[in-house]
């Protein structure tokens, strides 16, 4: 070989030239004018050995502030959670790692069963009847829920809370624009959706109402009070939810939600600089035939053996083409598998304990910050995120925290001008009391 990363020998080169009927490289490129050809050595660095390459790439990677080297209090949709070691071991099995959409069930039973288990666990978490095999992420899952609602109700207006993740709202608007849907935002009041404004906006032209639970500020929305406002007008109730929070909160399905979506990143999926992650999509039974994406069902073969197959395929783009419920294809099957393995490793009790730890540690952090004079503009129950008001720009505070080995919270001023100098703080089960106290002291000592 001429180079270890370019596995071509001189014999290989001559064989290829002979096959195409030319005698040399110069003859191959004879149609390129001489005056534009480059002669000489390219001004590039010499090739590195493998140890040298590892050292250089590691140095480049270390420039990033990551959760292995820093203590992270940054959330806003992507969280630093515990990932059981077994997750990567299962993911790296070649039959999962390289698998595509399992159109041939007779040779894909392992993949199909894994997807079926994912769907089952999503239904158990959300309190819904049917879940699909995954979506790209939480934002696209929410956008697909809006499209389903418009198609089902044959209405064009969408009401979405301003307390829904700002990036989710942008994705919804992008999808809605192509379908000529009207998207109207409902303001928040006290950190949760303003129910008086929502009630005033409800009408016979509303396809759906979109609420996040917990919402972007970490607050717990009053789904029980919202549901009758929505269904009184025969609109659909769409809830975007952090699946980990459902380990301690009442599932949206028990509050009458018609569609529940979200991102499975808290279970077994690294932060990965924002993606790829894995969306989930669950519905009540009447909407089953309009759900986007793959559905795996359990059946028995002619010999009475249990088996798994893709079901209700007539909805999908490989059959219906332009009339399909959506054009999502392979989805995020590998990340869905990661979530399934993590959930299986934790078990029901483990998920509840993990969610409880998130909630308890977040409440401890907020309480300690309030003792130092760093108050929250919002009262009411919250899960593992909360908002605090600073006396300095959030970016300045975060720059100081990074010098101390801490990744601070999200700058809410980016998306909410009225919340300039407000930080969204996330506290997960991985944060220790010592780390939380250190974070509190750094903010307090700096008179943030």
From Swiss-Prot:
Q: Which domain of life is it from?
A: Bacteria
Lineage of origin = Bacteria, Bacillati, Bacillota, Bacilli, Bacillales
Q: How does it assemble?
A: The glycine cleavage system is composed of four proteins: P, T, L and H. In this organism, the P 'protein' is a heterodimer of two subunits.
Instruction: Name any one GO molecular function.
Output: glycine dehydrogenase (decarboxylating) activity
**A matching Pfam family:** GDC-P
Q: Which residues cross the membrane?
A: none
What is the protein name stated in its UniProt record?
Probable glycine dehydrogenase (decarboxylating) subunit 1
List GO BP terms, alphabetically.
Answer: glycine decarboxylation via glycine cleavage system; nucleoside metabolic process
Swiss-Prot/TrEMBL keywords: Oxidoreductase
Reactions mediated catalytically: N(6)-[(R)-lipoyl]-L-lysyl-[glycine-cleavage complex H protein] + glycine + H(+) = N(6)-[(R)-S(8)-aminomethyldihydrolipoyl]-L-lysyl-[glycine-cleavage complex H protein] + CO2
Coiled-coil residue spans: none
Q: Does the keyword Calcium apply?
A: no
What InterPro entries does this protein map onto? GcvPA, GDC-P_N, GDC_P, PyrdxlP-dep_Trfase, PyrdxlP-dep_Trfase_major, PyrdxlP-dep_Trfase_small
What the record says about family reads:
Belongs to the GcvP family. N-terminal subunit subfamily.
* Function statement: The glycine cleavage system catalyzes the degradation of glycine. The P protein binds the alpha-amino group of glycine through its pyridoxal phosphate cofactor; CO(2) is released and the remaining methylamine moiety is then transferred to the lipoamide cofactor of the H protein.
The enzyme's E.C. designation: 1.4.4.2
